[in-house]
Amino acid sequence: MNELIKAINELKKEKNAIILGHYYQKGEIQDLADYVGDSLALAQWAAKTEADIIVMCGVHFMGETAKVLCPDKKVLVPDMAAGCSLADSCPADQFAQFVKEHPGYTVISYVNTTAAVKAVTDVVVTSTNAKQIVESFPKDEKIIFGPDRNLGNYINSVTNRNMLLWDGACHVHEQFSVEKIVELKTQHPEALVLAHPECKSTVLKLADVVGSTAALLKYAVNHPENTYIVATESGILHEMQKKCPQTTFIPAPPNDSTCGCNECSFMRLNTLEKLYECLKNESPEITVDPEVAKKAVKPIQRMLEISAKLGL
């Protein structure tokens, strides 16, 4: 393991590469990455890096976002099969048709989408900035929000809007069991529930804190004295435990106890071995059709500009 990590670091230096890791990656990848963060942070780092090569340890759409923002850089992913159930729930042709059927609507897309979906979007959001970006539009603005219906419903509730929602969802966040969380709360009455807004509303009603992975991490760091039940992909527990070694974090259980459904199987496809091979061979490489990229970059840049103004 140590030899492999050493070899990766040597290749990284030799090729002037940067490794970006999402909070849902395996712990050893998070520890090796130059920067670890949520989707917004990864996009921000990609946009300003001076590295020649960006290795995106996350899922495919994150690599696409980096490539759209940095068309002249080489963007690699350790495993091209690392997709996203949420992005897959929103095929670009179907979403484009949906937009066409609703003229006069502003289109807001969650970052968990393909570049082709972003290309028919007015502004992109992440779970960190979705509320603030939606609130930046007039109250009577007609908005299409996609693809996550759970996040859309949550944003509708906290902004008092009635956005038109695409019917997509993340398979991990859909799986959390209300009954089992209630049971855990009974066993640990002092525990606070931290939940990601991609969870169903029935889970969010049990939550003491609802927020993006970065927001949930920040809350735990600021209140390390609490015990937490964490309803998001379990990879975040690595960083939480690292930052708060004395704190007890309990992963919220899924409905199906026979599977590791609170883990994203796509995120887990990335390994140190694949990361080494990816850097060594400079492959697999993310490519985005230049015409699609030209359209997709505008809503992403708009998100980054609004986020910068809001201090996010």
Regions found by a protein language model. Give the residues of each.
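Active-site loop-to-helix "anion-binding N-cap" substructures in soluble metabolic enzymes
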Residues: 1-211, 215-230, 237, 242-252, ...
